[in-house]
From Swiss-Prot:
Region feature (LID): 126-136
Main location: cytoplasm
Record-listed E.C. numbers: 2.7.4.3
Name of the protein in its database record: Adenylate kinase
Keyword Cytoplasm on entry: yes
A cellular component annotation (GO) from this entry: cytoplasm
Regions that span the bilayer: none
Entries under HAMAP family matching the protein: Adenylate_kinase_Adk (MF_00235)
Chemical reaction(s) catalysed: AMP + ATP = 2 ADP
Record text about domains: Consists of three domains, a large central CORE domain and two small peripheral domains, NMPbind and LID, which undergo movements during catalysis. The LID domain closes over the site of phosphoryl transfer upon ATP binding. Assembling and dissambling the active center during each catalytic cycle provides an effective means to prevent ATP hydrolysis.
InterPro entries cross-referenced by the UniProt entry: Adenylat/UMP-CMP_kin, Adenylat_kinase_CS, P-loop_NTPase
SUPFAM superfamilies per UniProt: P-loop containing nucleoside triphosphate hydrolases
Organism field: Bifidobacterium longum (strain NCC 2705)
Its job: Catalyzes the reversible transfer of the terminal phosphate group between ATP and AMP. Plays an important role in cellular energy homeostasis and in adenine nucleotide metabolism.
Amino acid sequence: MRLLIMGPQGVGKGTQAALLAEHFNIPTISTGDIFRYNIKNKTELGLEAMSYTDKGELVPDSLTNKIVKDRLAKEDCKNGWILDGYPRNAAQVTALDEMLADLDTPLDHVVALEAARDVLLERMKKRAAEQGRADDTPEAIAKRLETYEKETAPLLDIYEARGLLVVVNGVGDIDEISGRIISHLE
C-alpha cells in the first residue's frame, strides 16, 4: 500500500502514520523527521534546512524532492510506504507523480486528517511545551498553518479528482482515529 497522509500541522499525521505503518508493515517517510534529525545533528542538510525552518518557512522543493526521491528508491519501500509531510504544494505533486512513474509504483490512497484550527493550535502549544521543538513558536505555528491553508489544502482537490482522497476526522482517541482510517483503506 502506498499512501500519502495529509493535513495541517498538529492534526496527528505523524502519530497516525506510525500506527498505519505498523498495521500495514510498511515504512513511514516523514520529511519533517528527516529534516529534524539532520538539524539536530547539524549536518550540511540540517543547517541548510534550519535557515528556513527557524523563520517558519518551508524548506525549498529542490531539497525536499531530492530527499523523497532517494528514500522512495530504497529496498524497504518496494512493498509500499506512507509519505508524511509531502507533497506540500502543486510543484511537489508534479515531482511526486514523476517519481512514482519512474518507479512504476502508483499511489493507492491519500488520507486527509481534519481538525478545527483551535484544536490544532492547542495541540501544537502542548507539543512545544513537551518536546521543546524550536519550530513550534507561536509565530512559526501561525505561519505554518497559514501556509498549509494557502498552498497544501488545495492539493486535496487534485487527489479527490483522481479518486484517491479519503477524508478522516482527526479529533478523538488515537486508536479510534486509526480505526476510522483503516476502515476506509481495507
